Every structure is written in C-alpha cells, then in structure tokens.
Amino acid sequence: MSQNEGAKFWLQVLTELKNRGVQDLFIACVDGLPGFEEAITSIYPQAQVQLCIVHMVRNSLKYVTYKDRKAVAADLKAIYRAATIEEAEQHLANFAQTWDEKYAPISRAWHQQWERVTPFFAYPPEIRKVIYTTNAIESLNSSIRKIIKTRRAFPSDEAALNQFAI
C-alpha cells in the first residue's frame, strides 16, 4: 500500500467513526502506519498523537547484537519510564553517550521522533501505561483473528458477537 493509499484508507475509517458519533479523540497511539497520523489530525485536529513506545523499542533493538540486547533495552526503558520529560531527555543523552559508538541509529531515531514519543509524559503514570502502546488493541485484534480463524463463518451477526461476549 502506498503512502497515499494508506492515508486514504485511514481517512475513510476515521471519517466513518466521526459520522457514527465519535466527535473527539483525546490521544491516539500509533505504530507508524503510513498516513495514519495525518488522517487522525485531519479529522480530529485537536487530537494528540503518541508514537507507540513498544514499536520504538522493537525497531531500536533490530540494530543490537544479542549480547547487548538486555543492556540496551534497560537503558531505553529508563527513557520511557522516567518520571518527567526532562528526566527522559537526560536518560536519552546518557543512552547516546553509552551506545552511540555502536548503535548511533537508535538515539538518532529517538531524537528524530522525540515530539511524537513524548506526549504521554503530560499524563499521570497510571495513565501513561495505557496510552504509550498499541498493545491493548493488538491483543484484541489477535483474539478476534483467532476466533475467526477457527470458526471461519457465522450464521448471523449476533452469532459472531456472541463469540466475543458482547
């Protein structure tokens, strides 16, 4: 799917949500799908967009040797688990100082995405855990795929919904 096709698709999805009554999005956590962020801000201009931290970490660890993975992951965790954005910035600087000789693309990516990585710092720690990752929706989608894969067909919409206890 090209960037333009992705944007069109997400624009249609979000327009349908708005037409069905979703008048406002407060914050949206995205995983970097092409066109998604632009579609969100087009339909919901006041929405904050948060880049998924889990996806940032996974993408960062692609550069890392197996031997260094635990240490690099721990240093990245210090960034997103910081109490304040200022503390997170300091942890990112420490990360760069420690790892840039071996893994400069990691800190470069975090610096480039910083404005999209940090919106969740405006919220209390209890809320941050919910909004900094797309894991909740990915888990739901996985459950839906599993049920659909085993059943393949449903006699009615109600029968399908009953599978999900809705």
Spans of features found by a protein language model:
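Conserved beta-strand -> loop -> alpha-helix junction used to position metal-binding or nucleic-acid-contacting
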Residues: I27-P34, A39-D75
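A detector of single, family-specific signature residues
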Residues: N4, W10, K18-N19, T41, ...
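A generic short alpha-helical patch detector that favors 3-5-residue windows
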Residues: S2-G6, A28, V49-C52, V64-D68, ...
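Short coil/turn residues that cap or connect secondary-structure elements
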Residues: G21, L25, G32, Y44, ...
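Acidic/histidine-rich catalytic cores and adjacent linkers
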Residues: A78-I166
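Generic detector of short, locally flexible boundary/turn motifs and exposed helical patches
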Residues: L14-N19, A73, P105-R108, E126
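RNase H-like nuclease fold core
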Residues: M1-V30, P34, E38-Q46, A136
